[in-house]
Amino acid sequence: YMISGMGSVFFGDYYGRNDVLFPVVSYSNNGADCLIAARKDDNNFALLLRNHYANGTVYTLTIPDDYADFYKYPVEALTTIRQYLMSSLGVYIEGVDNVGIFMYDNETFIVESFLDNDTIIKLHVAGGAKKLIDVRSGQELTPLLRKESESIFEVPLKPVFYKVFKLV
């Protein structure tokens, strides 16, 4: 997998766990930015395309023939997909597959692990959030990194467990 594109968290070549079968998308090289491509020998196959159209942006995500094959993508590719497709929501996950996020409109969201093992993810929150509060435990998380444009929080997750967070 090759990741490129201005603003992406990652840049370079990465390797997935297994081969993935997906349809080939035909697109005009001049009209689209290829943000993620699968590579095989000298061939590139677009997985995430970005087109600027009028006053907006259109993203095209190539879906594997078997939806579960998304889990075979490298962490870097999954994170880049989450980054671009969730940017308007204000929060996205950097981390492994099988972790979901459920957004609510009151500055609250749920992060759930569907894994069989412990994991640690990073939550990228737009703006300068000062802390996250774990609603169930009352624990306050402070950011690992805080910039004007985003704050990054490290969140440990237990297997098949969820956490509810409130932005402060």
Model-identified regions with their sequence ranges:
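A conserved amphipathic helix/loop scaffold
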Residues: 1-168
